Amino acid sequence: MFTLKKPLLLIVLLGIISLSLCEQERNADEDEESETKRGIFTKINKKKAKTGVFNIIKTIGKEAGMDVIRAGIDTISCKIKGEC
């Protein structure tokens, strides 16, 4: 019985050591991935901010342009009808 305990104990100890080494490597990989993700997200957030600003400018430009067109149409229709 004692002869079976030594190899079993050795296997358990080697398993624990390998698991702890794997866990350390996994933690290091997770740290690297989180830093990479932070870098990616800041780039994405900057792009979204730029896109948001451009969309706002574009919307304001469209509304201003439509107001000018409406005013021009009103002026032309007024002159055509002779009501001005």
Swiss-Prot record:
Q: Keyword set for this entry?
A: Amphibian defense peptide, Antibiotic, Antimicrobial, Cleavage on pair of basic residues, Disulfide bond, Secreted, Signal
**What role does it play?**
Antimicrobial peptide.
Protein name as catalogued: Esculentin-1Vb
Q: Which cysteines are joined by disulfide bonds?
A: 78-84
Task: Please state the span of the N-terminal signal peptide per the UniProt entry.
Answer: 1-22
| One GO BP | defense response to Gram-negative bacterium
Q: Which residues form the propeptide?
A: 23-36
**What is the organism field in this record?**
Odorrana versabilis (Chinese bamboo leaf odorous frog)
| Primary subcellular site in the record, as a coarse category | secreted
Q: In which tissues is it expressed?
A: Expressed by the skin glands.
Presence of keyword Signal:
yes
**Protein family according to the UniProt entry:** Belongs to the frog skin active peptide (FSAP) family. Esculentin subfamily.
Enumerate the InterPro entries for this protein: Antimicrobial_frog_2, Frog_antimicrobial_propeptide
Question: What cellular component terms from Gene Ontology apply here?
Answer: extracellular region
- Keyword Signal appears in the UniProt entry: yes
Location within or outside the cell? Secreted
